[in-house]
């Protein structure tokens, strides 16, 4: 009887230790912290990639980073699959939030920006972020909170 209780307790501990890890991720998604990640090799523009991620699972979006450890995890997943390439991440229209000024200190009032939106792609080898035309096509990573 004691072995049965001890064995049952051991299984309960094992089950609880798996909660919040890969056991909660959809199949073929990878887990890190409380999130699931999936690398998609097909190339899409930023808007289509974000829409594709949203269609995968409720709450899924293009990748966002919140720590250097998370970056290391994502690089470990993307680099072997995509080699030296860019992936779309969930940043776009970064210039709209900036207060720009000229080198002489005056505020930017007149501008001649292109109508093309700028989105951010991360380089798989070193996670450097690059602005790219949102209409370009790249692979991407979807992220899902579990």
From Swiss-Prot:
Keywords: Disulfide bond, Hemostasis impairing toxin, Platelet aggregation activating toxin, Secreted, Signal, Toxin. Expressed by the venom gland. Residues 1-23 form the signal peptide. The keyword Secreted applies. One of its GO terms (molecular function) is toxin activity. Disulfide bonds join 25-36, 53-142, 119-134. One of its GO terms (cellular component) is extracellular region. The keyword Transport does not apply. InterPro entries: C-type_lectin-like, C-type_lectin-like/link_sf, C-type_lectin/snaclec_domain, CTDL_fold. Residues 24-143 form the C-type lectin domain. Coiled coil: none annotated. It comes from the Eukaryota. Pfam families: Lectin_C. It is found in: Secreted. SMART domains: CLECT. Belongs to the snaclec family. Monoclonal antibodies to glycoprotein IIb/IIIa, to bovine vWF, and to bovine serum albumin did not show any effect on the binding of AL-B to platelets. Weakly agglutinates platelets at high doses by binding to GPIbalpha (GP1BA). Heterodimer of subunits alpha and beta; disulfide-linked. This is Snaclec alboaggregin-B subunit beta. The lineage of its organism: Eukaryota, Metazoa, Chordata, Craniata, Vertebrata.
């Amino acid at each position: 009887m004691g072995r049965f209780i001890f064995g049952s307790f051991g299984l309960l501990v094992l089950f609880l230790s798996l909660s919040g890890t890969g056991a909660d991720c959809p199949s073929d998604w990878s887990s890190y912290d409380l999130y699931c990640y999936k690398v998609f090799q097909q190339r899409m523009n930023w808007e289509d990639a974000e829409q594709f991620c949203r269609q995968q699972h409720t709450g899924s979006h293009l990748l966002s980073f919140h720590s250097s450890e998370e970056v290391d995890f994502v690089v470990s997943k993307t680099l072997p699959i995509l080699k030296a390439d860019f992936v779309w991440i969930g940043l776009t229209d970064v210039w709209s939030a900036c207060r720009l000024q000229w080198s002489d200190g005056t505020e930017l009032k007149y501008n001649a920006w292109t109508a093309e939106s700028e989105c951010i792609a991360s380089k798989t080898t070193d996670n450097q972020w690059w602005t790219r035309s949102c209409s370009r096509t790249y692979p991407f990573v979807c992220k899902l909170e579990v």
